[in-house]
Amino acid sequence: MTAHVTSGTGTLTAHMLEHVVLTMALAPLLVLVGKRLLRFLPTRVARLLVRLGSPPLGWTAFAAVTLATHFTGFYDYAVDHEWAHMLEHTLYLLTAVWFWWPVLGRRWRWSVPYLLAAMPVQAVVGVVLLSSDRLLYEHYRSLADQHRAGALMWFTSSLVMAAALVWAAWDWLRAEERRAVAREVYGR
């Protein structure tokens, strides 16, 4: 996924597409597959992985990596240094899996507020790129490209998170309905 950057012919929009695919497509898919694979792990390992999936830590790590890589000199550095670029992608994927785990990896009653709190983080980066009247990264020379990259990040991350939000709200409502029926039928 890094050839366009190292060749010097890439666009920020293409680079942003890589990030969106890693965090908003690949990571959720890995979580959906991963939760099914947990049953094949030794019980202790599976429990440890579930415990490490702390929602506040996952949210914080994902937000911190997103903001730090886009609003510090790290982004320019990563474009010029392949090892840093690979580290950047690894951090995006790992923190995104960590972020998505509470929402997709198990039923969690706080999924709706968790997603609502995460949406602005992605939106801020997208809006800053979209609305800036100056180039934010040395490697890229087109303000129009930067604006497209910002729109791509803002729109796609908002769309994916909104879809996840609808799913989480629906799942929560179904669970509440089941609990209400159980209370009515069994007096619990």
What function would you assign to each model-found segment?
Residues 1-188:
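Alpha-helical membrane segments of multi-pass proteins
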